[in-house]
Regions:
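Short, highly charged C-terminal tails/helix-capping segments
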Residues: 143-170
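Hydrophobic/aromatic beta-strand elements that line small-molecule binding cavities or substrate pockets
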Residues: 21, 70-75, 94-101
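Hydrophobic pocket/interface hotspot
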Residues: 30-34, 40, 58, 73, ...
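Intrinsic-disorder/low-complexity, polar/charged segments enriched in Ser/Thr/Lys/Arg/Asp/Glu/Gln
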Residues: 16-20, 57, 68, 81, ...
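Glycine-rich portal/gate segments that line the openings of hydrophobic small-molecule binding cavities
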Residues: 41-42, 47-88, 170
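Beta-strand/loop substructures that line and gate deep hydrophobic ligand-binding cavities in soluble
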Residues: 89-136
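Hydrophobic ligand-binding cavity/cleft-lining segments
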Residues: 1-49, 168-170
Length: 170
């Protein structure tokens, strides 16, 4: 892209991170895997202070990254959707999981994150990173629920000792 094209580029609305995945398990089982920290720790974060409950702050921890955040469920509609607020990259954002039965005991899970703030470059990075993170989470969920396999996708995304910037230099 030339500098002229770059200079004329602008966002017309704040972007939203969005991804989805078909999981070959019934809605109740897929929903439970997101709501219940004892299951979610098998494919996403490594520790949690408890099960999601509306209005109750919960701490999620990714020990491999020395990161923990507080999330608060804003809505839980059993087997339909979970909405949480969490710190986001530049301020609080809203994450929503929706669960739709597809037939034959399968579920389509959709995840969105909205409410990002920042300039255009920051917004594009935040949305790309968030979309990637939730895609890895859903792939890990799929592998765990369908096959009983822990892929460790979230943990392996940023392994210690690997500098991505060094890998992309020519």
């Amino acid at each position: 892209m030339s500098s002229t094209q770059t200079e004329s580029f602008h966002l017309t609305r704040v972007p939203i991170a969005e991804t989805g995945m078909l999981i070959r398990k019934p809605v109740a089982e897929v929903f439970e895997a997101i709501e219940n920290h004892k299951i979610t720790t098998k494919f996403c974060f490594t520790r949690s202070s408890g099960r999601l409950a509306v209005g109750r702050p919960i701490r999620w921890e990714w020990q491999m990254y020395d990161v923990s955040i507080e999330v608060t469920a804003k809505a839980i509609d059993t087997n339909r959707r979970i909405v949480v607020e969490w710190p986001g990259y530049s301020g609080p954002t809203t994450v929503e999981w929706t669960f739709a039965p597809v037939g034959n005991g399968t579920t389509f899970v959709r995840v969105t994150e909205s409410g990002f703030t920042g300039n255009g470059d920051q917004l594009v990075k935040y949305v790309a990173d968030s979309t990637q993170g939730f895609t890895l989470m859903l792939a890990g969920l799929k592998a765990f629920l369908e096959h009983g396999v822990r892929l460790n996708l979230v943990g392996d995304r940023y392994p210690k000792g690997v500098d991505e910037h060094e890998l992309t230099k020519e």
